[in-house]
Amino acid sequence: MNSLFRKRNKGKYSPTVQTRSISNKELSELIEQLQKNADQVEKNIVDTEAKMQSDLARLQEGRQPEHRDVTLQKVLDSEKLLYVLEADAAIAKHMKHPQGDMIAEDIRQLKERVTNLRGKHKQIYRLAVKEVDPQVNWAALVEEKLDKLNNQSFGTDLPLVDHQVEEHNIFHNEVKAIGPHLAKDGDKEQNSELRAKYQKLLAASQARQQHLSSLQDYMQRCTNELYWLDQQAKGRMQYDWSDRNLDYPSRRRQYENFINRNLEAKEERINKLHSEGDQLLAAEHPGRNSIEAHMEAVHADWKEYLNLLICEESHLKYMEDYHQFHEDVKDAQELLRKVDSDLNQKYGPDFKDRYQIELLLRELDDQEKVLDKYEDVVQGLQKRGQQVVPLKYRRETPLKPIPVEALCDFEGEQGLISRGYSYTLQKNNGESWELMDSAGNKLIAPAVCFVIPPTDPEALALADSLGSQYRSVRQKAAGSKRTLQQRYEVLKTENPGDASDLQGRQLLAGLDKVASDLDRQEKAITGILRPPLEQGRAVQDSAERAKDLKNITNELLRIEPEKTRSTAEGEAFIQALPGSGTTPLLRTRVEDTNRKYEHLLQLLDLAQEKVDVANRLEKSLQQSWELLATHENHLNQDDTVPESSRVLDSKGQELAAMACELQAQKSLLGEVEQNLQAAKQCSSTLASRFQEHCPDLERQEAEVHKLGQRFNNLRQQVERRAQSLQSAKAAYEHFHRGHDHVLQFLVSIPSYEPQETDSLSQMETKLKNQKNLLDEIASREQEVQKICANSQQYQQAVKDYELEAEKLRSLLDLENGRRSHVSKRARLQSPATKVKEEEAALAAKFTEVYAINRQRLQNLEFALNLLRQQPEVEVTHETLQRNRPDSGVEEAWKIRKELDEETERRRQLENEVKSTQEEIWTLRNQGPQESVVRKEVLKKVPDPVLEESFQQLQRTLAEEQHKNQLLQEELEALQLQLRALEQETRDGGQEYVVKEVLRIEPDRAQADEVLQLREELEALRRQKGAREAEVLLLQQRVAALAEEKSRAQEKVTEKEVVKLQNDPQLEAEYQQLQEDHQRQDQLREKQEEELSFLQDKLKRLEKERAMAEGKITVKEVLKVEKDAATEREVSDLTRQYEDEAAKARASQREKTELLRKIWALEEENAKVVVQEKVREIVRPDPKAESEVANLRLELVEQERKYRGAEEQLRSYQSELEALRRRGPQVEVKEVTKEVIKYKTDPEMEKELQRLREEIVDKTRLIERCDLEIYQLKKEIQALKDTKPQVQTKEVVQEILQFQEDPQTKEEVASLRAKLSEEQKKQVDLERERASQEEQIARKEEELSRVKERVVQQEVVRYEEEPGLRAEASAFAESIDVELRQIDKLRAELRRLQRRRTELERQLEELERERQARREAEREVQRLQQRLAALEQEEAEAREKVTHTQKVVLQQDPQQAREHALLRLQLEEEQHRRQLLEGELETLRRKLAALEKAEVKEKVVLSESVQVEKGDTEQEIQRLKSSLEEESRSKRELDVEVSRLEARLSELEFHNSKSSKELDFLREENHKLQLERQNLQLETRRLQSEINMAATETRDLRNMTVADSGTNHDSRLWSLERELDDLKRLSKDKDLEIDELQKRLGSVAVKREQRENHLRRSIVVIHPDTGRELSPEEAHRAGLIDWNMFVKLRSQECDWEEISVKGPNGESSVIHDRKSGKKFSIEEALQSGRLTPAQYDRYVNKDMSIQELAVLVSGQK
């Protein structure tokens, strides 16, 4: 009992004790003693049970028990302790101990256990007494066990089946324990029936154990799949498919990853479960109901899961369309808003001359052209808005029922929902919806199965607002153009003014026109470069862009003369009139124009090169895809293998030609790669020089990679199909040739039926011909088997070909976006089915012909015997009847008895023949099934248990190799993807940022807030600069009074420098700065020492001055203040201090930047799940690079070890082949080939093996019995054939002599020799088993030591890098893997223990074989006794003849005839029995041929002559080591894959703009905090210095006269004022930092706004026009007075409730959107303005938001 005070149910046991007072100390001691006694009882129970189990094992082995007295004494001691425990527990309960009830309950359970233990003790040790005098009614016990077993059923759920397995294991052990007792009951005749019943019981128990094991395994795997499917379905039902979910891209990636990688494997597992269930049902498994229920559940859940996959795909498409539409509309609105702001700001006519207005008019013309083109975009968005699905309704119940459409079929409790049908949504409950069908029936179904069809009111409103915005912009552009034209006409009529100014303005206008033209062309170039190519027409789009670039080139050629003329005129004007007012501006414009033109030429050249390269790349990609599509579509047309041989040849030639064509066209891939590299180079040049990134590069790289994969897949597809065709052709030719030959032979077989007119010679001729024909038919059986093997090969080849075709079709459907149920077309019938039918028909025909001819042979033999016996019968009738002695009558009676026995046996054989024929017809109707051809070979084979273990290890090893291969392929793919991402990161780091800016739009409110924060941050920066200038000025003034600079900041800097080890270049620069800093510090220290010396001297002089007169003091002070050297010294120190401060600020900035990078890296490493990453281009950590290099070296080493392990495995396999080839070479090869190629279910194999062994045993027993019976019959016949002797003899003495049969004696001797030999073999096997177990235990210990050492090494290695959190997590995972490996080793140990149990079971089987031999010996003894009895009867007959001395014995003719007839009947019955036995054997062979017609042939060696364990055991150990090598390499590959996946996920999600903004704000916040800390430190330092200066000033003020006091007072006042300003500045900084932190927190938290909003606006109807006016407009129009205006304004409101979920939980505020104020509900509750009852009324919607807002705001 581990703990006495664990929680239990309260018991009712409470013994009566005397109540007495007891202290707390005594109570605690009582509880302690009670705990000790209970532990002692628990220990006694455990010890007693262990010793009783050991004694029970000894009793079962027939030995005496050892621990009878010890166990009895411990039981008595436990009972005594229980009495004490009950009394102590009663006392504790009486004293109201808190755990008194639990203590009493535990003691009650202990008492029950001790009572059960005593009963078990009596039961066990009573067996020892019964062994001496056995009185058990074994027959009743066996009957009881058999009845109990027959009444057992199979559970319907997994826990019940597990319980049944445990119960039956106990039951089976009990059944096995009965066997030795039955074997000890002697050789009584009545015991044979009991043994037969026991064997039946044992067989039934073993069968139930196997059935339970198979059912448990099948139900466990079905339960695992059902749990996975349930979790997947629940995840999809609970997923948010509404507009609120913005994480749909990751869901799309997850969905595509599962579809491409895991769906096929999962479907194979589901299909495997169905096939295994069908096999169990076909084998008539007794747990049929449970298997069918689990099969139906898996099928239903898998069907539901496929339907949910269809729904998920549809929802992802709707979400993408929804969000893409909103992003496009937002972009369009931003563009139109920008155009509108440009029209307002840029195109105003005020303060512009004629030339500027002329330039603006030209720009407006271009703007109108752009707007005309943009009209198509707006109309397209309006059309798309009509197709957008209203996702918002998925998260809220609409005001009225709306129609929904079903995406899949779903069977609910209320009814069936059909795909494509429309229903009405009544209520939205989140995960499930309440619906109503067309008939008015209410249904409840998951929301994921439905979609709300278009249109979306919000999308329509957005599209309409976009259209109205577009029209307003067009109108404003037209109005601006009219205004500018009017202003232009006015300016044309005005006086031009000064000629030089007019000329300058003209030149400026010309340059502005050229510049605007250049800007327009640059925009056109960037407009060509920035948008990605259209997916469907990339080649045409790139060609059109090339044409556009040519047009831009022509435009530049047109602009060049004008640019040259304008710049030349401008330069001439500048030289002619350098003093003019427009000359500086004109010079700047000329330089800008020339620079812009050169920039534009370079950009145009690179753009043309990039577009040309992209065009070539897209063309090559298109050609390659078209070529692949041609071949793939051609291959996709073939569903199966052609039937005729000629078409097979043509198809093979066609595939060979296609393979050659693919090899010849492989150069296209090289061309594509070259074009891709050229595109990368052009894109990198554009990105580095002009910051123009290529948006198509990532897609093009993916296309090239995908093209290479598709090309390789197509080439492999062609190769595999060609191999399958070649194999199918060869197999089909062999099959067809053999089939036609055998069929022709079977058809042309002659018929030798007996006729009534046939003579004896004709009958003999027919019989001879029939025997020859039957031998010839039997010789053709091998040919039929070969034909079946060829058929199987052909079917397998066709199946492989069809599998490749199905793979290609699935791949093309997935690539083309077709669904499986859409793309399925009519399939041709497989020729394998036809060949299979022909094979079955041929086998049936052969079996039928063989049976018919066998029957004909029997008929001929029977007719021939009748013809031969006919003359004897006639002679017998003509013989005279004479008397015969009594011995002839007795002999006739015996023969008649034998005749009856033979007749009964013949009847049994006929019934068996009929049952076999019925089974043959059943098999014919059912189709061919699996069969096993059994060959008996006398050879040494391994132990079957070890062989099975060896096969299991081989399968495990193959699975591990397959998994490692898959992981290796996945690792290579991830490495390729990682290298591609790293290359993109190195080539163009800003590419993803630009892309995200174009595609990802942050929340509008968040964007506004970020902009506001940016503006405030800029203001803070400007204010910080001003404050820093003030601080520097203050430092200059106070520097003269500073005594020593605080070293704390330097120490902090040094500490941070130690940590900055990420960038070697920065580290080197920082080391250089540190050295310079140290030199400056040394110089500063020297100067400070000089300053301190001068200050000490100054103090000393001041003290001396204090002792002198006032005038002298004044003069001395003036001299000290005006000392030029000191002033120079102070100014030098001030300058040095400023330099030091500047350097410190620079180093602080560097430190801050490095810290920011470190934090960014740490955040990136820590954020594994969160998808918000910062796109920062940083240099990697050198240690991380070295660690990566080490890991790569380790990976290479592990790959080398993996290859070594594979080579070693191959060598082991070759050794295994050599071991299997021992003995007859041909047989070993055939067996090895067949066993490796085909593998059946191990449980079915065990059952077949057991049945084969039983058949062999029965067959051998029957053969031996038949042989002995035949010998006895020969002896009987010999005795009958001996003629009676006439003897005249006088008997003097009667002597009875019994002699043993020599043959029987020899047989007994041989059996005894065999028995001794088997006993020796058993001893050798036991000795070998003990040695093998010792070797296994030793190997397990060695393996465990090796694995523990590996774990320790890995832990030490991983702990060497404590700075990397990701590495540490990887190390923790590796430790978990090693722990799981230890668990696997423990499981392996348990498996070996089970194998030991299996060996013990084999020994028991050997014991049963010995019993069978003993029974055979007893049967031989019985036959010997019978033979002796027959001899005795013969002797008695002779003695009887002897007593009648002179009587002449003659045969009675009548008796002689009867005797002859009986003998003929006996021989005839024997002959018929032999014929029936032959026919039965023939039918059995036919049955075996029919059973093997469908599946592969297996050659099973069933006779184990000598069990050898050593080589196989070593082989198992070697395979275990190789398996561990494979597992270790798999774990290492898993670690590498997980690391690469983590890094890949970091690179993929590294481009989030919102995360970048937040991190930027965090960095700014951190900088401000650092500045705040620095300012606080500087403030404290300056305050201390000012305090010192103030002290000195007070001293000086006390010592100096009035004229000097004024100067000191003014200086002190200025210092105090500066100190106050600095304190105020610090407080302001603190407030600003807190405000920024609050805003940052508000940006960081996730907002969830409750849809509770009230807005009331009041309008006034104009009485004349009817137009709606606001109160303000009505007041301005004079419709209402001021008081009415104030009253109406007060009635307007715009309240909104906002619920914010932040780090501190959820909080709600009332937002007055009209005034911008926010009122917290929590504060109102705390202050009492709002009561909880009122708030509950609001929550229950009994109070409006307006009333709540009035209460919260306090506006009562």
From Swiss-Prot:
Region (Interacts with BFSP2 and VIM) residue spans: 1557-1756
UniProt record, GO biological process: intermediate filament cytoskeleton organization; keratinization; response to mechanical stimulus; wound healing
SMART domains reported in the protein's UniProt record: PLEC, SPEC
Chain ranges of the SH3 domain: 399-455
Subcellular compartments: Cell junction, Desmosome; Cytoplasm, Cytoskeleton; Cell membrane; Cytoplasm
GO cellular component: cornified envelope; cytoplasm; cytoskeleton; cytosol; desmosome; extracellular exosome; membrane; plasma membrane
Spectrin repeat spans: 216-317, 323-485, 505-612, 733-861
Description of what induces expression: During differentiation of epidermal keratinocytes.
Transmembrane annotation, as ranges: none
Protein name (database record): Periplakin
Species the sequence originates in: Homo sapiens (Human)
Protein's gene: PPL
